[in-house]
A protein has these predicted regions:
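Phosphate-coordinating loops and pocket residues in cytosolic domains that bind phosphorylated ligands
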Residues: 154, 220, 339
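Pocket-lining segment of extracytoplasmic ligand-binding domains
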Residues: 109, 118, 186-187, 192-283
Length: 340
């Protein structure tokens, strides 16, 4: 159980964009119509687009976005958000490049692979989450004979998809604890996070690497037991999720982007300091497929931290660790996804 995991309250001043947005929204809320200048962002011109198609991972990694959506922060900026849960990162990224989505929120590993391997024109516009203790871990069942990471040798460790961030985090922690990755079996096919606990309980996999809220749900429903926290060593406080647009979309929608970021930054700040806000936002989503979390899970699930802006040095950790574990053929400079 994660009843002992407490949300970490951080005292931090509002970022300049968020502060400006809050002040402007207080004086101008409710005055914007379609095509109007964003009331909260102080945009210098009309919004190029007021209805955005946004695909985001339905997990606690996206809490800042869900808070902004729940609290009407995008609406205050003159934006209507059409939200789609991003179940498969590869599918969503390909659809985004094809124009189906304006902005997506997903794991950095998948985005970097698409840029490094397929030269997709993707730009990181904001950070979404950093891993915190308890927010991702490896689990077994209560009667499992596996009691340590070393005992995973020869066993099947369930991950969301081959070569994605779920694999990378597990690989980093296993290696740090002296486990040869060649001695651990991984599924050849993806296992959706909502199905992973059931696979574990049915004995189809011997252990499972799961993020929140799926981890706490597995504990509540099946009695799953934490074997190892993934927040350690090379993966400690690891950047997990970011928000991305194509380079052409960023260039063609500067005012819309500014409005989106103003709302998102407010959501990030609230999520980072108010556990109650995160619980309420995720409890009221339309269904489990969209990220809805029942109150019994929301009350005890561990949360990430939710940074503001983009930190190049911090994000460079992701491709560096990817290269170390063979997910990139050569070193990758994250600056090419930041416009620098």
């Amino acid at each position: 159980m994660k009843g002992s995991v407490m949300f970490k309250v951080r005292s931090r001043a509002l970022s300049p964009v968020a502060a400006l947005a809050l002040l402007a929204a207080a004086g101008c809320a409710g005055t914007a119509g379609a095509g109007a200048t964003a009331p909260g962002s102080g945009a210098s011109g009309a919004l190029e687009k007021t209805t955005l198609n946004v695909a985001v991972v339905p997990a606690v990694d996206s809490a800042g976005f869900f808070v902004a959506l729940h609290d009407g922060l995008f609406t205050r900026e003159g934006l209507t958000i059409r939200y789609t849960p991003a179940v498969s990162s590869d599918t969503v990224i390909n659809q985004q490049v094809a124009g189906a989505y304006d902005i997506t929120g997903g794991n950095y590993v998948s985005y970097i692979q698409h840029v490094a391997n397929d030269h997709q024109p993707l730009r990181i516009i904001a950070e979404g989450s950093l891993m915190e203790p308890g927010s991702q871990a490896i689990y077994t069942m209560p009667r499992s004979k596996i009691r340590s990471l070393a005992q995973l040798k020869g066993h099947l460790l369930g991950i969301n998809a081959p070569g994605n961030i779920n694999y990378l985090l597990a690989a980093a922690v296993l290696t740090q604890n002296g486990v040869n990755l060649r001695q651990v079996r991984f599924p050849a096919q993806p296992i959706p996070f909502p199905a992973m606990a059931g696979e574990l309980a049915a004995g189809k996999i011997d252990a499972a690497a799961m993020p929140e809220p799926f981890a706490t749900a597995a504990e509540e429903q099946y009695g799953a037991v934490e074997l190892a926290d993934l927040n350690q060593g090379a993966a400690e406080n690891f950047p997990i999720l970011g928000y991305v647009a194509t380079t052409s979309w960023v260039r063609e929608h500067p005012n819309t982007l500014k409005a989106f970021l103003a709302a998102l930054e407010q959501g990030q700040e609230i999520a980072d300091t108010s556990r109650t806000a995160v619980e309420q936002a995720m409890e009221t989503l339309s269904g489990p497929q969209d990220g809805q979390v029942p109150p019994i899970v929301a009350a005890v699930m561990a949360l990430d931290s939710y940074p503001i802006g983009v930190d190049k040095i911090r994000l460079q950790r992701v491709p560096d660790v990817m290269y170390e574990f063979g997910l990139l053929r050569s070193p990758f400079n994250i600056g090419q996804m930041l416009g620098s």
